[in-house]
């Protein structure tokens, strides 16, 4: 952090005494340099080595430092002695060595005079990382936590925006909310009591005025209020639920149940618990469950993780033995051998949890040669477009799989006999259809629709429906290419029948033509009716004629002789 010292105390001094020495060093004039902090640390090492005891305020006065050996360390000790003498005590003194724990923690020396303020500069990422590293093992809101942040603030003179950035980097979302609430109340109380020096209510709030370049004392007062708001943070473990780890023989359900109980007891109301459970159910799981979940990844839902790990049984759990009388041994059904997990990571993707034959990246690489069907070197034979059907409706793009709609309507045998054949005319294959549904116009209860066996779904024109029908854009592949802006999906059900008396079938998904051109009966209707399409043969009357003059050539005599081409010998 530039000229900033290390807030972690060296060997031979307590954290409170080390913070007091650092605050005293900040009062040096001129300002302390990195060499001053190095001399201070070397002095503590020398004192602990020579005196055979830790440094305290009572044992390490200004006379304990040899002159001329540790630079300006005697001035630091004299400043500390002067401040503590004015305070009338030694709040930073450590507990005696012979006093056993527990004992009250020592108080931290408050800053009386900050001396010459440093110029403002924005936080660097390295500084934020160092500050977070120094306070990560300290309880939020404790005296050591507050004074460590105070020393960091003295180095950069941060604005309110910089302090907000620091709070977002070092504090949890729960602590950020509590700190902001306390800070807002403290600023409002200070502005109402008119105790702020240099504050003018007509020019804006304290936050706005302290952000100005020439704020001076106003910024210092805002920083003190920001630090005081940190004292109201609850001193609790940062995340007690993070220490819950799944045991070697513990089931996933019991492990997730313990996580939920810990979150319910320690997490405040209103804070979402699902992201924490999703993360820890994978990160703190045992080795066997992590190998099973490796293919799903840490972003899978908790329910999917529990289902995946439910089939795994711990090795040290033996099945219960049933006491039975001896008798003849009867052969039972042969049980399939259990699938053993792979011994190591997949050699294709270097991930654990699956064999190389089941690797999802198996077919993502380039083929070794061109396709044997179309000679295209960019795809495998199984992905050749010439093997796929061209004239079909596909949702979501050209590579989406074809969906097969199951038959959910139960039809009687008499109804099936009536619907086994749909007669169509050869000139125009249309059929009369009786429609009903919540999104259909009342006048469109009967219509003539074109039967298209190349269409996977039924298509209705948009003017048959009401204006506010639920729609989802669809990409459709037809004979003219891909249409992405013309068709919509209607998710509402549509009841359809080929006869007024029924039977009626329900189609859950229909394509809507926004151009009002097509009314097509797709393959989904015959598949649900289990019907076939029959087109009668067109019978033409025979043509009888009389030849006036017989032709001069009958057969192939009038054609020219074929060219003589030498053939490849068969032998």
Curated annotation (Swiss-Prot):
A lipid is attached at residue 2 (N-myristoyl glycine). A zinc finger (CCHC-type) spans 345-362, 370-387. GO terms for cellular component: viral nucleocapsid. It is an enzyme of class 3 (hydrolase). GO terms for molecular function: aspartic-type endopeptidase activity; nucleic acid binding; structural constituent of virion; zinc ion binding. The record marks 109-110, 323-324, 420-421, 545-546 as: Cleavage. Gene3D superfamilies: 1.10.1200.30, Acid Proteases, Human Immunodeficiency Virus Type 1 Capsid Protein, Zinc finger, CCHC-type. Its EC number is 3.4.23.-. InterPro entries: D_retro_matrix, Gag_p24_C, Peptidase_A2_cat, Peptidase_aspartic_dom_sf, Primate_lentivir_Gag_pol-like, Retropepsins, Retrov_capsid_C, Retrov_capsid_N. One of its GO terms (biological process) is proteolysis. The active site is at 453 (protease). Sequence repeats lie at residues 342-362, 367-387. Transmembrane segments: none annotated. A motif (PPXY motif) lies at residues 100-103. Keywords: Aspartyl protease, Capsid protein, Host-virus interaction, Hydrolase, Lipoprotein, Metal-binding, Myristate, Phosphoprotein, Protease, Repeat, Viral budding, Viral budding via the host ESCRT complexes, Viral matrix protein, Viral nucleoprotein, Viral release from host cell, Virion, Zinc, Zinc-finger. PANTHER family: ENDOGENOUS RETROVIRUS GROUP K MEMBER 24 GAG POLYPROTEIN-RELATED, IGE-BINDING PROTEIN. Gag polyprotein: Late-budding domains (L domains) are short sequence motifs essential for viral particle release. They can occur individually or in close proximity within structural proteins. They interacts with sorting cellular proteins of the multivesicular body (MVB) pathway. Most of these proteins are class E vacuolar protein sorting factors belonging to ESCRT-I, ESCRT-II or ESCRT-III complexes. Matrix protein p15 contains one L domain: a PPXY motif which binds to the WW domains of the ubiquitin ligase NEDD4. This is Gag-Pro polyprotein.
